[in-house]
Regions:
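Pyridoxal 5′-phosphate
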Residues: 1-480
């Protein structure tokens, strides 16, 4: 039984959990909402979290007044900001049970930048102009395994890197064929570099990947295991070192998906044994111990410093740590129980709506992510109607998971080729997809019913409940 199934076995069990409405209502009261449309329901949490007023206030009122660059401890403001930055880094490391051998880098704007950084540091990337030359001379490629559930950032990035990529086959019921993985690893026992780069949970269905078992399998075959926590990090425990067999060699996630997290950087944490570089991937200010006019220089030995060239994301890292702190104060046990309670409410409502189905609905225990297909309404129209006519914010498309979409929608090669040929000709309306609804534990039962009512109204072609929104007020009015 995996961690998403650890305490509940049926939806009926879930519905009996005390909802603890007062606690979650208090959390919700601090979420920054649309001032013009207070009744608008945000159900796109897997794409982005929302701002949390106590965090915004603390950054503005406490951090803002002392804002300064780091890279110095001689001045008071420089010393304070450097201290706060290091404290924030420790909060993040402790949250994932990183060891003293693990390196933390805050990179880009999400896990995409974090994974790109890892691939470049490992030397598995080059510019397309040089790709053919490099491949001709590099010898045996590293071998990378991914699952059929990956989103594009953990798929196409590997396709375009200097590795051989294999997708672990899917089994019936949307499961993952781990026996195939073990057999393939055995057959590749002479391959020098092997790794799995896998999602902890799907951003399409919310189904958890058995990444602990995969980590153990990979390590038994002297291979690495990298885990993408982009969809699940705001809601689940993350432990890089649970035991000697299931440790994680690298993890990456997107703190902007946390409540309170928008405006943060991507997070990459990896074991320093992976790092063999003499030259940082991005040389710059803060990476050198000294330089001189004759082209000589020496890089700092500390990996975290030498791989964080230029001014670090100071506010971004502090915000990440505060979002992590908020998650810990909410508690993953509370989050899990609330998720399953809200999931049961929404599943029970959707199951009764004709012309609507949830993808992989056999997996009831999941993160609060529902990808919905309307029989008689295309996903783009459905999302527009949900937003404009019923004030429910969702997301349409393939959720940047086209390969998984082929599996979920049973698209064979011939059908896929017909579609992609037309997409190449810019007929974007033919692109298959779904409507993704994603929830947060701080949402109320009333909001879940509003979402379900809106889905039913769209499926039935009901009239709009609200007038189309007016043009958004410009944020670029004069500031002074």
């Amino acid at each position: 039984m995996n961690s998403v199934e650890k305490s509940l076995n049926t939806v009926a069990d879930t519905a009996e959990i005390a909802p603890n409405n007062d606690f979650w209502a208090r959390i919700a009261s601090h979420v920054v909402a649309d001032p013009d449309y207070q009744n608008r329901v945000y159900a796109d949490w897997t794409a982005s979290g929302r701002l949390f007023k106590p965090i915004e206030d603390r950054i503005s009122n406490m951090v803002g007044g002392l804002m300064a660059n780091t890279h110095t401890e001689d001045s008071y403001t420089g010393r304070v900001m450097t201290t706060w930055l290091h404290e924030a880094e420790q909060v993040i490391k402790q949250h994932v049970n990183a060891s003293s051998e693990d390196i933390l880098l805050n990179v880009g704007s999400g896990m995409t930048g974090a994974l790109a950084k890892l691939i470049r540091m490992m030397g598995w990337w080059c510019h397309e102009q040089h790709r053919s030359i490099v491949l001709e001379n590099m010898g045996q490629k590293p071998l990378v395994y991914i699952t059929h559930r990956e989103h594009h950032s953990n798929h196409t990035m590997w396709i375009e890197s200097l590795v051989e990529l294999r997708i672990i086959p899917a089994l019936e019921g949307d499961e993952i064929d781990l026996e195939w993985l073990e057999k393939d690893l055995f057959n590749e026992k002479n391959r020098k570099i092997k790794m799995a780069s896998i999602t902890a949970a799907s951003n399409v269905t919310g189904i958890e990947t058995p990444y602990r078992r995969i980590a153990k399998i990979m390590h038994e075959h002297k291979a690495y295991c990298f885990v993408d926590f982009a969809a699940s990090a705001p809601y689940v425990d993350i432990d890089m070192h649970p035991n000697d067999e299931e440790w994680l060699d690298a993890i990456f996630f997107s703190p902007h998906k946390f409540l309170g997290g928008p405006g943060s950087s991507g997070v990459l944490i990896f074991n320093k044994a992976l790092y063999q570089n003499k030259v940082p991937e991005q040389p710059g200010g803060g990476t050198v111990l000294w330089t001189n006019p004759w082209g000589e220089h020496r890089f700092i030995s500390n990996i975290e410093q030498r791989e964080s060239g230029g001014t670090p994301g100071i506010l971004q890292t502090i915000k990440t740590a505060m979002a992590v702190q908020l998650k810990e104060e909410m508690g993953t046990k509370n989050i899990y129980e609330r998720e399953q309670y809200l999931n049961a409410l929404l599943f029970n409502r959707i199951d009764k709506i004709d012309g609507v189905r949830v993808l992989s609905d056999n997996h009831k225990h999941r993160l609060s992510i529902f990808s919905i297909v309307f029989e008689n309404v295309d996903y783009k129209t459905a999302v527009q109607r949900l937003s404009n006519d019923f004030h429910v914010e969702t997301r349409g498309g393939c959720a940047c998971a086209g390969t998984y979409g082929h599996h979920l929608l049973n698209i064979d090669y011939c059908t896929s080729k017909s579609i992609t040929d037309q997409l190449d000709d810019e007929f974007q309306s033919l692109k298959p997809g779904w409507v993704r609804v994603s929830l947060h534990p701080c949402m109320s039962e009333s909001e879940i019913n509003t979402i379900a009512d809106a889905i039913e109204n769209v499926a039935n072609g009901a009239n709009a409940m609200f007038a189309a929104p007016e043009k958004t007020q410009s944020i670029w009015a004069p500031l002074i």
